[in-house]
Amino acid sequence: MRTGLIITLFFFSFCGVAQERLSWSALEQIDFTEVYDEGTASWVQVPQWTPELRENWDGKEMKITGYAIVLDPVDHIYALSAFPFSSCFFCGAAGPESVMELEFERPVELITDQVITVIGTLDLNTSPEHLPITLVGAKLKE
């Protein structure tokens, strides 16, 4: 009985460490190419994902801390930024590697520049209609 309890506790001690912590500095490895997008009639920066980055990040559960950016408060659409809104990608002060889309499991209420930690699955994107990285199934870490 005691052995079974020890094995069970040992197993559950690993359940909370499945995700890796992702740093904003690691995202600086991403190279971008500027291409003209006919759909938006504008120049956009498209990420060039190396096989190594895809293997290490795509589809992996990650945890990251940053500043919430409210894109649409009614539809609960948010981004996460390495920097506060006044100096983030949307204001032209930072690169596209410093921001990611958040797709929450459930609607959440956030305010711009609220510092949050989120956990979710990384989706590496090349579509000019989305940010380079989306955190899918995101949950707020308490």
What kind of region is each of these model predictions?
Residues 18-142:
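OB-fold and OB-like single-stranded nucleic-acid-recognition modules
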Residues 6-7, 17:
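Short hydrophobic transmembrane-like helices used for membrane targeting/insertion
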Residues 1-4:
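Positively charged n-region of N-terminal signal peptides that target proteins for export
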Residues 13-15:
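N-terminal signal peptide c-region/cleavage motif recognized by signal peptidases
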